[in-house]
A protein has these predicted regions:
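Extended, regular secondary-structure scaffolds
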Residues: 170-171, 177-178, 187-188, 194, ...
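A short acidic (Asp/Glu
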Residues: 19-23, 70-75, 159-163, 194-218, ...
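Active-site cores of enzymes that catalyze phosphoryl transfer or operate on phosphate-rich substrates
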Residues: 3-7, 12-16, 85-167, 237-379, ...
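A structural motif corresponding to the C-terminal end of an alpha-helix
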Residues: 43-58, 130-146, 180-184, 219, ...
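An acidic- and aromatic-residue-enriched active-site/binding cleft used to recognize and process polar
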Residues: 13-17, 62-68, 153-156, 163, ...
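Trp/Phe/Arg-rich N-terminal binding region typifying the photolyase-homology
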Residues: 3-108, 127-131, 135, 164, ...
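Extended hydrophobic/aromatic segments used for targeting, binding, or gating
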Residues: 170, 218, 397-426
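CE4/NodB-like, metal-dependent polysaccharide N-deacetylase domain
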Residues: 167-195, 366-376, 380-383
Length: 426
């Protein structure tokens, strides 16, 4: 009899700042257009294909209020169709140019490949999703497959908001926006930048006034939210895998100052990122809230362009683009290779590499869950959060990889595929 090892929960966090009315390129409308064309719609296409094939693609997806409002705005909806037509025409112009100048046959074929890509995205956007990306995700949630979570209304960094009323307003407004778009209150929340602050006695640096400030969990519970997500270092200690201190000397100095004043608080029990926990709140809130912890082992093999799957030679290179038009015709070849030496992209080489990477990921999940169960005598859960825009935008083939992972996990009796809401309810 096959032994069940535990659960796996994929979490995709999607967020963009408000760009409508701020021009087109490079940080205006094209920002959300690219994300919709390369990430959100291709992800929906893969999820609905799984449903059509009889699968149950369970995962957690965060759509921030700002992004949600943008995707429902008429300016985006009308402009997005024009964007897709424009990209299609770029591929047509490239075909004519490459043919006239007798470029290699593979590069000419790729222009047709791009035409087919943007045609499929447009067809699904208009015909299957009725120009409503948010509604297409809502339908999957109504089918009890995905769990859509919210975030701070303006993606405000909660620990640095000086007034508690501002923190409260972030979550209250987010819940109100969510109800309007999804017809129900959210159960979970993605803290912007995973930034959490516990309760403490705060001293005003100007007036010297002191008073008790509740932790972020208080405002989460107050607004009816039941769980959030944290980075591994917040639970287990140690340094998080950030890069900003290395880039900004002043930030590094501030970090040194913090380290000199920091004292580790001992805990009375061993903690693990492979199980959720509850954080107590005040009696005035509905009850404690739960939190899940990011697993770094499954994280680094995906988000790292140098050590992870996106850096494989066969995948489409993100940086090298054809001018004019900006379409991509080259593969990674090697992550650190000069752009001038990148080789032509061959779509036929991709499925085999995707199978290899998805198989490796599945085995990694099993190894982690099996090790945890052997050591602790109980089943754990791997929570794997990523920026949604990594898949499709940065890693073009990423959504195809996600589909393989979800399909193969559901076929595997050793792993339970779940989302955060279902797991906590059970």
């Amino acid at each position: 009899m096959t032994e069940n090892l535990g659960s796996f929960c994929l979490v995709l966090h999607s967020h963009l700042p408000w760009v409508l009315g701020h021009g087109v390129w490079p940080h205006g409308m094209d920002w959300v257009n690219e994300a919709a064309a390369e990430t959100y719609i291709p992800l929906l296409m893969e999820l609905y294909k799984l449903v059509d094939d009889g699968y149950h693609p369970k995962l957690t997806i965060g759509i921030t209020p700002v992004l949600c409002e943008m995707l429902r705005h008429p300016r985006f909806i009308n402009g997005f169709v024009g964007y897709l037509d424009e990209k299609f025409n770029v591929a047509v112009n490239d075909y004519n140019d490459f043919t006239e100048n007798r470029y290699e046959e593979g590069r000419i074929k790729l222009t047709k490949w791009w035409q087919e890509f943007y045609s499929r995205v447009k067809e699904n956007f208009i015909q299957r999703y009725n120009k409503n990306i948010v509604g297409a995700f809502k339908k999957l949630q109504d089918m009890n497959l995905i769990d859509i979570i919210t975030s701070g209304a303006t993606h405000g960094y909660s620990p640095l908001l000086s007034k508690d009323t501002s923190i409260d307003a972030q979550f209250k407004t987010a819940v109100d926006s969510y109800k309007r778009h999804f017809g129900r209150p959210p159960t979970g929340v993605w803290l912007p930048e995973c930034a959490y602050r516990p309760g403490y006695r705060w001293k005003n640096p100007i007036t010297g006034e002191e008073y008790e400030r509740p932790g972020v969990e208080y405002f989460i519970a107050k607004n009816g939210l039941k769980y959030f997500f944290i980075d591994t270092a917040l639970l287990l200690g140690g340094k998080s895998q950030g890069v900003y201190a290395a880039r900004f000397p002043l930030l590094a100095e501030l970090w040194k100052q913090f380290e000199s004043q920091y004292k580790e608080i001992p805990t009375s029990f061993e903690k693990s990122q492979y199980e959720p926990y509850l954080v107590s709140t005040t009696p005035s809130t509905p009850g404690p809230v739960g939190f899940f912890t990011r697993d770094e082992k499954t994280g680094i093999v995906v988000w790292s362009g140098e050590h992870g799957y996106p850096g494989c030679a066969e995948y489409l290179d993100f940086h090298k683009k054809n001018w004019p038009g900006g379409l991509k015709y080259w593969k990674v070849t090697s992550p650190k290779l000069d752009l001038g030496k990148k080789m032509l992209y061959w779509p036929d080489d991709v499925p085999g590499k995707l199978d290899e990477n998805a198989g490796h990921y599945l085995n990694l999940i099993k190894e982690i869950l099996k090790d945890y169960k052997n050591k602790n005598g109980k089943k754990g859960i791997i929570v794997a959060p990523y920026d949604a825009e990594l898949f499709g935008h940065w890693w073009f083939e990423g959504n195809w990889w996600i589909a393989r992972v979800l399909r193969w996990i559901e076929d595997d009796p050793e792993i339970d595929l779940t989302n955060s809401r279902i797991f906590l309810e059970n």
